[in-house]
Amino acid sequence: MKKTSLPLVTLFALSVLILSACTSSGAASTSPVGEWTLVTYGDASNPTPALPDVETTINFNDDGTFGGSVGCNSFGSDYKVDGDQITFGSIVSTMMFCEGISDQESTVLGILTDKTVSFSMNDDQLTLTSEDGNSVVVLARK
């Protein structure tokens, strides 16, 4: 009887291990990994809607890097998530001038450059809030 029980117990334990590896942990739902599009930005108490004809995107990669486009210029850097905080490294960006979008571009890049910001996720929306709580960037999952 013991010889039959041991293989069954081993098989059961192995099955549980394999199935638990396939289930999702709750952490994935709070990860910014993915592609996002700008919705609003600026003053937290009265954010400005994103310019309608300017697609601003940010793509957070699971390797700790991110990049995107602020309509005219492309940018990239690294980031680290710790709880509800994201720390961004120095941004590398192209530096073209495009009339009419400089406020949006400078505000978005300003909150992402060499800073730690808090973030929250609600459904398919990611909100980045400056350390002083005065500035926000709100993004929608693309």
Residues of each region from the PLM?
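Lipid interaction determinants
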Residues: 2-142
